[in-house]
């Protein structure tokens, strides 16, 4: 497994190492610790690949083709080259993806889920059941400030939603959290300026636990996936809302209802305007809100939730690479 330098990925790698050793008696190492030509190395797994890697990737050249495996993590708007240029995918003998379009087109590709931030046990603890409806604020959004020129991106749309609710909600009704806000994220913003959100409340510390603990204090969450056009892309954005007992106003990919019951979330596409969306949530009765939470509780205690777990993700990778449980 080639090294990546981000702290979240390091934590993910440590969990993957422990899980593989416990369930498959397989050791997982970063590339600098092994010789890919050795018979002891059964596979070299890349998490995403793009033209940026290809320019200077001396690692892949040393890996026998039959050992090369690729996990396609990001959607088209973040890593377009892996989708539009098959040349990069053809460098690998095994490919894993959640993208249903690729899976239907290439029978050799292997299906995986988009892993969530915690295991089902954490989601099912229901720690926030004691927070009453009357104690909650109206609306929250938690996301990173991003920019993309790709048409599949929802960044422009969700930023428009944030600006609308900042301007039209009553004071204290809407709060924005996340990284990168109130600073430029594109050349045009650096050149012409950018909008400063007065509703911005900063970053949330404590990773996953801090995020859901903060969201638990709100009735609703604006929940826009980074990409809403690729079937199969359902990230932790919606399941984190469920853990926080915060009803998501969800803008996601086609076919979401095949994985998550429609009774658990509000479809952002059903509204003709942001004003219609605001009117819908501000006029919702406590009883109707409780119906959403009841549906969420049913889903959270169903076997379907296991599909979103990191354990399911690890198992799909292990078995797709040919490893067997001991």
Predicted regions and their residues:
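Pol beta-like nucleotidyltransferase catalytic core
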Residues: 1-53, 58-72, 76, 83-145, ...
């Amino acid at each position: 497994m080639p090294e990546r330098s981000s702290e979240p990925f390091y934590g993910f790698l440590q969990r993957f190492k422990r899980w593989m050793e416990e369930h498959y008696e397989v050791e997982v190492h970063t590339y600098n610790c092994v010789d890919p030509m050795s018979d002891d190395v059964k596979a070299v797994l890349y998490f995403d690949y793009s033209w940026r890697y290809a320019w200077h990737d001396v690692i892949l050249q040393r890996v026998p083709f039959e050992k090369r495996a690729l996990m396609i993590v990001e959607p088209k708007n973040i890593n377009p080259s892996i989708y539009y240029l098959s040349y990069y995918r053809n460098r690998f003998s095994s490919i894993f993806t959640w993208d249903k379009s690729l899976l239907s087109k290439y029978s050799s590709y292997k299906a995986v889920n988009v892993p969530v931030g915690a295991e089902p046990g954490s989601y099912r603890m229901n720690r926030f059941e004691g927070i009453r409806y009357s104690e909650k604020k109206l609306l929250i959004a938690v996301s990173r400030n991003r920019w993309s020129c790709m048409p599949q991106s929802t960044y422009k749309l969700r930023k428009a939603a944030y600006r609308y609710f900042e301007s039209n909600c009553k004071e204290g009704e809407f709060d924005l959290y996340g990284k990168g806000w109130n600073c430029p994220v594109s050349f045009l913003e650096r050149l012409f300026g950018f909008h400063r959100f007065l509703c911005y409340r900063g970053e949330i510390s404590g990773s996953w636990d801090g995020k859901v603990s903060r969201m638990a204090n709100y009735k609703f969450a604006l929940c826009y996936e980074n990409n809403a056009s690729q079937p199969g892309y359902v990230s932790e954005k919606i399941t984190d809302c469920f853990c926080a007992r915060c009803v998501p106003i969800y803008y996601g990919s086609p076919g979401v209802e095949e994985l998550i019951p429609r009774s658990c979330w509000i479809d952002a596409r059903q509204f003709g305007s942001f004003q219609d969306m605001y009117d819908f949530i501000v006029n919702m009765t406590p009883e109707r809100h409780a119906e959403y939470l009841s549906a969420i509780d049913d889903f959270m205690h169903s076997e379907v939730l296991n599909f979103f777990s990191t354990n399911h993700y690890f198992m799909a990778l292990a078995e797709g690479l040919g490893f067997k449980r001991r």
